[in-house]
Amino acid sequence: YEQRAALAQRSQGGADLGRCLRDGGGAWQDSKPLFDILNTWQTSVQLREHAMSTDFIAHLRAELDGLRAAGLYKAERVITTPQGATVKTADGREVINLCANNYLGLSAHPRVIEAAHEALRSHGYGMSSVRFICGTQDLHKTLEARVARFVGCEDAILYAAAFDANGGLFEPLLGEQDAVISDELNHASIIDGIRLCKASRWRYRHNDMADLERCLQEADAKGARFKLVFTDGVFSMDGTIAQLDAMRALCDRHDALLGIDECHASGFMGRTGRGTHEHRGVFGKVDVITGTFGKALGGASGGFTAARREVVELLRQRSRPYLFSNTLMPAIAGASIAVLDLLEASTALRDKLADNTRWFRHAIGAAGFEIKPGEHPIVPIMVYDAVKAQQLAARLLELGVYVVGFFFPVVAKGQARIRVQMSAVHERRHLETAVAAFAQAGRELGLVK
């Protein structure tokens, strides 16, 4: 009664209700006044809750209006087909798709789809459990072993999302006595994961080895117990490739661990598609590798971390996204095994992607556009002005080419661009049509002559 009375007195009409609840006899003798008071109190609480809800909704609307006014609102276009060289939009138009992470064209590959169907038939739709209770099937263990072999590590652990792989990495491994050193342009999942750990933090200028060494020297001077340098293997907005060979040398000099996120590299970077570490000649010499099944490796969802067996074992015990998230669905596990079968059997898809990338980079430059130099299938076409980037993307869609403009806060102010992504599923006719559309739209908007 005392607790109820105290709660009631915080609301309008609470004094009367409080007296009734404290009264062991009199107020309960006549129930009508009590129920009148209860009704009044309940109504006042409901009104207060409604007012709070209205204020909150008004706040959210103001936030959304601000995003629209600043040109930062991200609209979602609906497509009605699988990912491919072309897709159909909700209005039924078929457009050339230049903005998917479907680097190898495997998201709709017949063998991958059949493997997913077979896993559904043999292992079910979902596990309704986390891994350590009853959510581990033979498919999951097989995939972990295959991933570890593919990227050149002893063991691997699966996550429901690649974001979780990075989000659950740093806190279990690093403590207050340690240091983590991160590239300034690392992915949001790396940044968020680092924020969750207690290690001292350094951030070095993008791909700048001199500044990385400065950070390592400062961590040494502070007496850091363990040091972990972590970088994207490939940076998603620029397509720049981390200098892992130089980074490995620096880490060896300063007795530091090296970790990479391979989301935009696994499956196609390097001679056999093993990733950035193969591309840079340090395959088997990277301590921790995170990656995704949501891009080149099938395009669905899910992520992984690969490392020494002791690292993976500790993550199984302490990585919160792994411990408290449902298991990767069997169909994704089965399909991902089929993806690795394809990639280990042949480099044909990787080779075609490289050919498409070389051709498009040359052709779009010849059309008068400025692009970020490089060799990655991410091709940033620089527009610089955010409004112009949105106008260019909209006009290209009208011309039958689906791309997206990127601008602040996704990239720095004044660095707006169209990010084009090549795929092995593109044929030359798709790329020729796309370059012609870029040239037409660019002339109309005064971006090229």
Where does each model-flagged region fall?
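Conserved PLP-anchoring active-site segment centered on the Schiff-base-forming lysine
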Residues: 169-188
